[in-house]
From Swiss-Prot:
GO biological process per UniProt: COPII-coated vesicle cargo loading; intracellular protein transport; macroautophagy; positive regulation of ER to Golgi vesicle-mediated transport; positive regulation of protein exit from endoplasmic reticulum
Chain residues that bind Zn(2+): 231, 234, 253, 256
Localization per Swiss-Prot or TrEMBL: Cytoplasm; Cytoplasmic vesicle, COPII-coated vesicle membrane; Endoplasmic reticulum membrane; Golgi apparatus membrane
Protein name in UniProt: Protein transport protein SEC24
One GO location term (cellular component): Golgi membrane
Annotated spans, Zinc finger-like: 231-256
């Protein structure tokens, strides 16, 4: 078809009713700037005057589908005039082109008479989709001419969810869920499965129910009156997108369209604080909580229970792990959540036997109180029994002093222990019987490979298997079925297993991580841990302390409901999948994210669809609550609109989860193929269906601006330790895979594409506190602008900081001037600076040293994850570097490791990003 040859434009691609927009339009999805401000006329910009409707006589560049819909517009408009939708206001399609009266945000639409507001600056422009609704525009770019890629796009918000205010009962920014809680890969949902399949874009939801480690930080609004209004048919909860009908006596569900009665209690309020139904949280807020009444509770919410299972074998003692663990517990006993003063503690020590401790109440203390803490050793590992169960799980409040006394005695008891065995399996079963009546957390701290009793593991032979097709089956699979079967038992009694593995030796993370994966826990791995290195101690103790002080909820289930046509099909993350649509969490942590895959099972007739996530939970303050997260999304029959509203970061998270699953269940090669194919399919589909160009190999590599970082993220993911080819120790690879499947989105992106900062030429305000309008300093430090992760931007005399979310690398160029070296390290000789896992020394009277340390501290400051990044100091190559320098080998290893984070470069056998794009272009041109 000849008219297809004209589909490549040096500007935004056109659809019926849209204004042409310059190609230079930024990717922030903002409306075009006023041309008059730039001294240009609208005619020069190729845009009609403000408020004008495009002439029907003007040439329109349309796909066949658009032409067909173009012909149907008059008929559809006429039909709309004849329709009478119950309680749904009809909007004149042409009204979007006329001056609008702003809607008063926060006021119920039933109390307003104004038409819909025109979008404000920073919102999607009023470009009409094929059904005459405002939709996001498509801005084409050429990936090969945008090199290096504009990495600032990684910090942009997703394409807006274009929901007109009249769709909300009380229009406000809180009426639709924030992307911090839930992000859809598609912010314009295809109306049928064939369009979704044709797009080659995935449909999934990235969900993070909690945003902070501690629940008292920015909590959502809470309903405490006990009234919970749900649809009788689909059981969805009342939300800002329902409609009231029959003079407000009934409400229509936005999920299944059923009309339900409105409870009288909705309009009853405290006489001293009169409120209308529109003041209720479920009407105003898409994210809110209910205090659950008794019918949502099978039993009294249990107390928060912690069972610490501590390795006291010889390797744990020699490495300093035991002493570090005990000291951290002693310093943070008062930080363990105990909101209702019911928190309980149990401590088990394990080597070739299980050592229980009877801890008396503080009120029973007397002059011989130290003798009242009895240790009972159980050597029968086949059928271990509980000698005194009632006195081994004790109240933190009632036994606080004696718990501290016990912790101070444990290092003394085992200081001369020569036993090298570690019976983890029997100890887990004992802990299970100890706290199984109420559930809780089993926190394992281990520095030894389990080598005794049930769950005994062997060191695997990695030579000849690493970097082959056998790697997954022989190194990344679970070595003993106990570690999967045990999680089923734990899920039944609400027990989570968390692991802290710290050793210089092999630990079989691939097997042990199953304990946390299926019980909603987490595995933390500290390779090469040594108590002689203070930096190792700081990292372990910081993360362990934040973990045990983190709030969590118990007896938790999470379900996502979709409106008609949508169905949740697959679930990814750390939890137990109890049924086809129910995810069970023995305890729900605050530092993890989850991904749900969505199917379009039947055609969606409505202009908007909805997803609602409900989390039923017991807090560690004796309260039973329900957290509700509701998301509204527009639907479309236009492939261009689907692409224009695609969220590149959420899509990257989707394929990351798919790749982790493929790596664990199939092979690493299959995972890499999946990652690369995701990019190839999207580029090919965009070229075929959107660009529609018949030009040969010289054609540009087109993609829409809102997806231009997606190929970079996927290419970077293939270079991640979890997936890259080459020799990677199996423990490191298994740990990386474990982290990728549970990281919150912003940390996942940083893990895939690290932040790189140039420090030697940073702005004057970088490294200093943010100033308020009054000139007062805040506690937040100004960070430098990041640069692309490529060595081509590294100067031999520069200073650079790399942050991949797990580690920090401070790269000092080998030819740095002595003044810079002195300002940072307090010495002018670059060969005297410390290298490896170190901290920057404090240099008196050096403002630059203070600024660099401030930046590092700011990057380590998190209130939503427990991670503490160790700092590695790397000295760059120099022509003056002595060949036989004492640190030559260590420096070479550090340079190789740090360079592997510069993911735009050619790394080992992996091509550079430019080469990757050339390969993709060649493949889709065939």
């Amino acid at each position: 078809m000849s008219h297809h040859k004209k589909r490549v434009y040096p500007q935004a691609q056109l659809q019926y009713g849209q204004n042409a927009t310059p190609l230079q339009q930024p990717a922030q999805f903002m409306p075009p700037q006023d041309p008059a401000a730039a001294g240009m006329s609208y005619g020069q910009m190729g845009m009609p005057p403000q408020g004008a409707v495009p002439s029907m006589g003007q040439q329109q560049f349309l796909t066949p589908a658009q032409e067909q819909l173009h012909q149907q517009i008059d008929q559809a408009t006429t039909s709309m005039n004849d329709m009478h939708l119950h309680n749904v206001p009809l909007v004149d399609p042409n009204a979007y082109m006329q001056p609008q009266v702003p809607v008063q945000m926060g006021t119920p639409l039933q109390q307003q008479q104004q038409p819909m507001a025109a979008p404000a600056y920073g919102q999607p422009s009023a470009a009409m989709g094929q059904n005459m609704r405002p939709m996001n525009q498509l801005y084409p770019i050429d990936l090969l001419t945008e090199l290096p890629p504009p990495i600032t796009d990684l910090t942009l918000p997703p394409p807006p969810l274009v929901i007109p205010p009249e769709r909300m009962l009380v229009p406000s920014e809180l009426s639709n869920a924030s992307p911090d809680y839930i992000r859809s890969t598609l912010n314009a949902v295809p109306k049928n499965s064939s369009l979704l399949k044709k797009s080659k874009l995935p449909f999934g939801l990235v969900i993070r129910p909690y945003q902070h480690l501690y629940d008292d930080i920015d909590p959502p609004p809470l309903n405490e009156d006990g009234l919970i209004v749900r649809c009788r048919r689909c059981r969805s909860y009342m939300n800002p997108f329902v409609t009231f009908i029959e003079q407000g006596r009934r409400w229509r569900c936005n999920f299944c369209r059923l009309a339900n009665d409105v409870p009288m209690q909705m309009d009853q309020s405290d006489p001293n604080d009169p409120k209308s139904r529109y003041d209720r949280n479920e009407i105003k807020c898409a994210v809110m909580e209910y205090m659950a009444p008794k019918e949502y509770t099978l039993r009294q919410p249990p107390p928060a229970t912690y069972c610490f299972l501590i390795d006291v074998s010889q390797s744990s003692i020699k490495s300093g792990l035991l002493a570090t663990t005990i000291n951290t517990l002693l310093q943070n006993l008062d930080s363990i959540p105990n909101h209702d003063e019911r928190t309980r503690i149990s401590i088990l020590c394990v080597d070739n036997a299980i050592h229980y401790f009877k801890i008396p109440l503080d009120s029973e203390n007397n002059e011989e109180s130290a003798d009242q803490i009895n240790m009972m050793d159980i050597a029968d590992l086949e059928e271990p029994f509980l000698p005194r169960p009632n006195s081994m799980v004790v109240s933190l409040k009632a036994c606080r002093q004696n718990i501290e006394t016990l912790l101070t005695k444990i290092p003394q008891i085992f200081q001369s222990n020569l036993i090298t065995n570690f019976a983890l399996g029997p100890a887990l079963k004992s802990a299970y019987h100890l706290i199984g009546g109420v559930g809780g957390k089993i926190i394992v701290v281990s520095g030894t490979l389990p080598n005794l009793g049930i769950g005994k593991l062997q060191r695997r032979n990695e030579s000849g298997v690493v970097n082959t097709s056998k790697e997954t089956a022989q190194l990344l699979s679970c070595q003993d079925s106990f570690y999967k079967n045990f999680t089923i038992d734990c899920s039944k009694v609400q027990i989570t297993v968390d692991l802290f593995l710290a050793s210089e030796d092999y630990m079989d993370v691939a097997s042990l991580s199953n304990l946390s994966r299926f019980t909603a826990g987490q595995t933390h791995f500290y390779p090469g841990f040594s108590g002689k290195n203070p930096n190792d101690i700081v990292k372990f103790s910081t993360e362990f302390a934040k973990h045990i002080s983190m709030d969590f909820c118990m007896e938790t289930v999470m379900r996502a409901r979709g409106s008609t046509g949508l169905r949740m099909s697959r679930f990814y993350g750390h939890f137990f999948n109890r049924s086809s649509d129910l995810c069970a969490f023995s305890t729900m942590p605050r530092d993890q994210s989850y991904l749900f895959e969505v199917n379009v099972d039947e055609s969606i007739m409505a202009d908007y669809c909805y997803v609602q996530v409900a989390v039923l939970l017991s807090l560690n303050n004796s309260q039973r609550r329900i957290r509700i997260i509701t998301l509204a999304m527009p639907t479309t029959e236009s492939l261009a609109e689907v692409y224009a509203s695609a969220d590149q970061l959420a899509i990257a998270s989707f394929y990351n989860s798919k790749a982790v699953e493929k790596a664990l269940n199939s092979s690493l090669d299959d995972a890499r193929v999946l990652i690369n194919k995701s990019v190839q399919d999207i580029l090919a589909t965009y070229k075929k269906e959107i660009v529609v160009s018949n030009t040969a190999g010289g054609a540009p590599l087109r993609l829409c601006a809102n997806l231009r970082m997606f190929p970079l993220l996927m290419h970077s993911l293939t270079k991640h330790m979890a997936f890259r080819s080459g020799i990677v120790p199996s423990d490191h690879r298994a740990s990386a895979l474990n982290n990728l499947e549970s990281l919150p989105l912003k940390y996942l992106i940083k893990n895939i594409y690290p932040d790189v900062y140039s420090l030697h030429d940073m702005a004057d305000e970088a490294g200093l506190p943010v100033q308020t309008e009054d000139g007062e300093a805040t506690g937040t430090i100004v960070l430098p602008q990041p640069i692309n992760a490529t060595s081509s931007l590294f100067e031999r005399y520069g200073l650079y900081l790399i942050d991949n979310g797990n580690e920090l690398f401070l790269w000092m160029g080998g030819d740095a001037v002595p003044a810079l070296v002195f300002d940072v390290f307090g010495t002018q000789d670059i060969f005297d600076i410390p290298i490896g896992k170190q901290e920057i020394p404090v240099v008196e009277n050096s403002e630059f040293n203070q600024r660099v340390r401030n930046i590092i501290n700011q990057l380590r400051n998190h209130d939503d994850v427990i991670t503490y990044q160790s700092l590695y100091i790397v000295r760059g190559a120099s022509l003056s570097e002595p060949v036989n320098h004492a640190s030559a080998r260590e420096v070479a290893t550090l340079r190789l490791w740090a360079s592997s984070t510069l993911v735009e470069d050619k790394i080992l056998n992996n091509e550079s990003y430019r080469e990757f794009l050339q390969i993709m272009k060649a493949r889709i041109s065939k």
